[in-house]
């Protein structure tokens, strides 16, 4: 086997008892690969481990977890200064794994790990909210955000992405749309949004294709709004094709400004952010990520 530079795996603490992962790491180590492993316990650990990775001189920092772990690691990487910043590798171990699934990361741990170490590093975009918080996949607001935020951890652990749908049906009678105004390049809309998706990536909420035209290296954010006054009719209408659906508003821009008369919540790769004003902008070619050669989210 060809020699590869060292990697550091930042593993979400919930995945420490994953026996197949342990076996995959040991096998690659036996084949001569150097893989350091660090486990996160609390917020901020990923940033410290990325700094350690730079001191070790590794070529890749692998995010082992779900969308939240990928977000935390990628955010730490784009905040690094200087040269020789490691590439991002992805090892999907979360509940939904929306970003990993949409970019074509293999489900098999051994194949995903090899790709994370030896795959081609491609420059991709990230997005930033209010000059502070970042996301690599998607910002979602409205009905979908409240569902993903409120779904019990035990339900997610047992059922995975399906848990979001089940919890949503249970809560349907209490959910209301978010009234807001959204501006972008050659875009303006004001009204009631049941679901709002602003995507660098394409899917969220356990496999829902909210922004099916998004690409991660085109310098643009894709916006999709599901409008309507009542939850159930609007959700049923999402089963129609886009051409026949009057409840879908779409736009594309390198930035979007969102204003609301009341506090609303956006879910940024699994992390909630509440407020009345949001400025969301793309950060072109913000980091390098090891992706499969047939990744569908590259232009």
Curated annotation (Swiss-Prot):
Active-site residues, Swiss-Prot/TrEMBL: 271
A biological process from GO: phospholipid biosynthetic process
Record keyword Nucleotidyltransferase present: no
GO molecular-function terms, A-Z: ATP binding; lipid kinase activity; magnesium ion binding
Major site of localization recorded for this protein: cytoplasm
Record-listed E.C. numbers: 2.7.1.-
Cofactor note: Binds 1 Mg(2+) ion per subunit. Ca(2+) may be able to substitute.
Occurrences of domain DAGKc (ranges): 2-133
Residue ranges crossing the lipid bilayer per the database entry: none
Cofactor names: Mg(2+); Ca(2+)
SUPFAM superfamilies (UniProt xref): NAD kinase/diacylglycerol kinase-like (SSF111331)
Domain of life: Bacteria
Positions that bind Mg(2+): 215, 218, 220
Residue numbers binding ATP: 40, 66-72, 95
Pfam families: DAGK_cat (PF00781), YegS_C (PF19279)
Keywords: ATP-binding, Cytoplasm, Kinase, Lipid biosynthesis, Lipid metabolism, Magnesium, Metal-binding, Nucleotide-binding, Phospholipid biosynthesis, Phospholipid metabolism, Transferase
EC class: transferase
Places the protein is found: Cytoplasm
PANTHER family linked: LIPID KINASE YEGS (PTHR12358:SF106), SPHINGOSINE KINASE (PTHR12358)
Family statement drawn from the similarity comment of this UniProt entry: Belongs to the diacylglycerol/lipid kinase family. YegS lipid kinase subfamily.
Purpose of the protein: Probably phosphorylates lipids; the in vivo substrate is unknown.
Protein name listed in UniProt: Probable lipid kinase YegS
Species assigned in the record: Shigella dysenteriae serotype 1 (strain Sd197)
Lineage: Bacteria, Pseudomonadati, Pseudomonadota, Gammaproteobacteria, Enterobacterales
């Amino acid at each position: 086997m060809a020699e590869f530079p060292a990697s550091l795996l930042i593993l979400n603490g919930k995945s420490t008892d994953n026996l197949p992962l342990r076996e995959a790491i040991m096998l690659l180590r036996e084949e001569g690969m150097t893989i350091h492993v660090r486990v996160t316990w609390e917020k901020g650990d990923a940033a410290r481990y990325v700094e350690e990775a730079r001191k070790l001189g590794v070529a890749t920092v692998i995010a082992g977890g779900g969308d939240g772990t990928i977000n935390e690691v990628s955010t730490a990487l784009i905040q690094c200064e200087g040269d020789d910043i490691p590439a991002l590798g992805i090892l999907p171990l979360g509940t939904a794994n929306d970003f990993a699934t949409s970019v074509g990361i293999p489900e098999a741990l051994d194949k995903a790990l090899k790709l994370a170490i030896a795959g081609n590093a491609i420059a991709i975009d990230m997005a930033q909210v209010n000059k502070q918080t970042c996301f690599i996949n998607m910002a979602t607001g409205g009905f979908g955000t409240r569902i993903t935020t409120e779904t019990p951890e035990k339900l997610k652990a047992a059922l995975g992405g399906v848990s979001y749908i089940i919890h949503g049906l249970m809560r349907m009678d209490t959910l209301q749309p978010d009234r807001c105004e959204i501006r972008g390049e050659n875009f303006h809309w004001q009204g009631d949004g049941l679901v709002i998706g602003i995507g660098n990536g394409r899917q969220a909420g356990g496999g829902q294709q909210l922004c099916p035209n998004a690409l991660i290296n085109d310098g643009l954010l894709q916006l999709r709004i599901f409008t309507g006054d009542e939850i159930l009719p609007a959700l049923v209408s999402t089963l129609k094709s886009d051409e026949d659906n009057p409840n879908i508003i779409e736009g594309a821009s390198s930035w979007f400004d969102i204003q609301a008369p009341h506090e609303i919540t956006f879910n940024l790769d699994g992390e909630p952010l509440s407020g009345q004003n949001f400025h969301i902008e793309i950060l072109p070619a913000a980091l390098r990520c090891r992706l499969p050669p047939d990744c569908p989210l590259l232009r």
